[in-house]
């Protein structure tokens, strides 16, 4: 299982922007391939996504520099090494880059290589990827957090909250969970049409209508759930990704669609009122990534009622997560492999979270590819929850379809209502 050659290429993501894909070719002829997503709403401390910044090509968004780094330095450094030792490969990649945020080689170049090595290993062993990724954690089929109403940076509309998600916790297994979500998605389209609202979709496949308030969004979802024949609060609960850093300006959080602005305490009260009115199980990035005093207050007041997920807050970084744990901030972490840049560091963040009673949510990015690696990683890590968008657009459904295949192979338990246990 030794590496013969690594080569990369520039491909397009789901937004039509360039991204990188890497092939790790082993001496036995096996080829492991991986491509890297890109976010729109990003944390300031994410690992560096290397772009060319050439205005004459792809408006500066090309990734030929990252491709060159893979084809030259990375290829030379890893040739002849075994893909059986993922930590060693990732350590060498980080040493080769030798920056805190992977800005020399680019986290996109490093991650494409790291994930392609893991896939090459699975193929060489003739085992499913989720099996070779598992490190002894109890594997489960995750509850999908289905983003069927889009706003914020993921849509061209007036909605402030970035993602309104449904979680089919009452399903007996993953295929039924997917069926429930899909049926609600299609009913929601008819509900929107009936009210004269736009049914165009945003970056992650959810509908992106202009509506009057965040409560109206939740009311529309509630109506669709009921009309689809499901029980709100029993079969389905809500999850929100506020992406509050996108709303924060000059000390206040601005809800433009509602013509309101809040300080941290007022916004926490706003969430408390929403939670009392709707079965909301999870709130992601409820406050700005730098508002740690506000986060501490949010966790104290609402942490025993809902899952409080840090995305921009923690950026899948074990060091930052450790700071949050020490200060009692949030109670869950969003896992995005491209925020940190290697599989090994991603695993470190997951383990650190588990060891300290934090939940993990596996996640895609708004600019995705057809790569399904995160579906296998969600199962392998036993995180029990996955965010991979709505129920349309192949870049989103590819992950759901991979989970269906895994479910067929593995007969694993569905996380279901267990994720609500605090």
From Swiss-Prot:
Query: Broadest EC class?
Result: lyase
What GO terms in the biological process aspect are recorded for it? glycolytic process
| Record localization | Cytoplasm; Secreted; Cell surface
* Cofactor(s) in the UniProt record: Mg(2+)
User: What SMART domains does the record point to?
Assistant: Enolase_C, Enolase_N
Q: So where does (2R)-2-phosphoglycerate get bound? A: 162, 336, 365-366, 387
Metabolic or biological pathway, per its Swiss-Prot or TrEMBL entry: Carbohydrate degradation; glycolysis; pyruvate from D-glyceraldehyde 3-phosphate: step 4/5
Q: What is its main location?
A: cytoplasm
Q: Where is the active site?
A: 204, 336
**What's in the keyword line of the UniProt record?**
Cytoplasm, Glycolysis, Lyase, Magnesium, Metal-binding, Secreted
List the catalytic activities from the record.
Answer: (2R)-2-phosphoglycerate = phosphoenolpyruvate + H2O
Q: Does the keyword Phosphoprotein apply?
A: no
Q: Name one GO cellular component term.
A: phosphopyruvate hydratase complex
Question: What EC identifiers does the entry list?
Answer: 4.2.1.11
GO molecular function terms here? Answer: magnesium ion binding; phosphopyruvate hydratase activity
What residues bind Mg(2+), as annotated?
A: 241, 284, 311
Report if keyword RNA-binding is assigned: no
Q: Return the cofactor note field.
A: Binds a second Mg(2+) ion via substrate during catalysis.
Q: Which Gene3D superfamilies does the record associate with it? A: Enolase-like C-terminal domain, Enolase-like, N-terminal domain
HAMAP family registered for this protein in UniProt: Enolase
Describe the protein's quaternary organization and the partners it interacts with: Component of the RNA degradosome, a multiprotein complex involved in RNA processing and mRNA degradation.
Q: Which family does it belong to?
A: Belongs to the enolase family.
Biological role stated in the UniProt entry: Catalyzes the reversible conversion of 2-phosphoglycerate (2-PG) into phosphoenolpyruvate (PEP). It is essential for the degradation of carbohydrates via glycolysis.
Task: Give the protein's recorded name.
Answer: Enolase
Say which species the protein is native to.
Legionella pneumophila (strain Lens)
Where is the organism placed in the taxonomic lineage, from the top? Bacteria, Pseudomonadati, Pseudomonadota, Gammaproteobacteria, Legionellales
